[in-house]
Amino acid sequence: NPTVTPLGNFMHALKGKNAIIISPAPRAEKTSTKTVDLIREALAKNGAPEDLIQIVNDVTIEKSQELMANCDLVIATGGSGLTKAAYSSGTPAYGVGPGNPPVIIDRGYDLKDAAENSIIAVASDNGILCDGDNLLLYPQDLEAEFFEEFRKAGAVVFDNADDVAKFRDALFENGKVRPGLVGKDTNVIAEAAGYNLPEGTKVIGLKIEGVGKDDILGKEIMGP
């Protein structure tokens, strides 16, 4: 996440009496830079050195590699490629790879509450956070009731296999999420699949029959 990750890592670094340099994702450089600028302003207002947090400008792979090779500790948040690069940098590293937490909705739990909280989690920052409720597992006999609560809470649910297949093709290419759809609004994702959504749609729900390797939609998507 281009805002939460720099902020969270900075707070942990500061608590340990460390400075931190952020190497942002290229497509999110403006957002991360704005976040760092706000933190630097807050540091200055409180009489602390602004350079406790810095950011790499015009980031490139080469700059990131140089930074990893010369710092004291690497905290790598991203895909498997980034994590592998961090572990191969020669510098002690903590790596965080893809996340796609499944949420199990048990019988007897408040379906309205489950739907509302899941939508809050996934809609936050357009699903960029990889700890959102990306996969929901629910009792099959409660499907109709759960879907209804999901729709009331602001989701559009596609439960027809042909519709879901179009989203599958739109979201993934050669087994990987299309970068151009990461963190995009629901209407942008829907249009890529050939659909128009009602205004104000917070989350797109897709019914799948398999989990894990049985359906690629069970992978990390990073979108609402």
Where are the regions that the model predicts?
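Short, ordered loop/turn segments at secondary-structure junctions
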Residues: 24-27, 60, 79-80, 98, ...
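Conserved small-residue-rich beta-alpha loop and adjacent elements
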Residues: 1-41, 46, 89-91, 100, ...
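Glycine-rich phosphate-binding loop
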Residues: 74-86
